[in-house]
């Protein structure tokens, strides 16, 4: 029902930061939506049936119908967005990581202030896609897990 981030870096810091970040609901976080987009229909229906969908901001998607449109866009582009859905002023972009069998096993994401991310959206998307490809190609043990 939720996604847990366990690693973060900050570009203007010389200190490597490893920590857990508050658990965010899947339906309103980029990493959660990246994973949900690849659930089969039965698993997705079960998620929406049991999940309490609360509006966190004016932009939060809270219906299965609205998510289905988002799901199609995610599958076409390969990227999921949190466009101020979890927190106002925050924009996140995520890509699912697949194992050899085609199952989503993890997600990677980039987050930042809305204005800053919008100014570099295409560049960030390209770098995120490159990182996704690198991780999938060079990670052999991912086939042991599935979200």
List the model feature ranges, each with a label.
Residues 91-95:
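Short hydrophobic beta-strand micro-motif common in sensory/regulatory domains
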Residues 3-9, 14-19:
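Amphipathic coiled-coil signal-relay and dimerization helices
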Residues 17-85:
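Short, solvent-exposed recognition segments
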Residues 97-100:
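Sensor-regulatory modules in signal-transduction proteins
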Residues 88, 105-147:
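Juxtadomain coupling helices with adjacent low-complexity linkers
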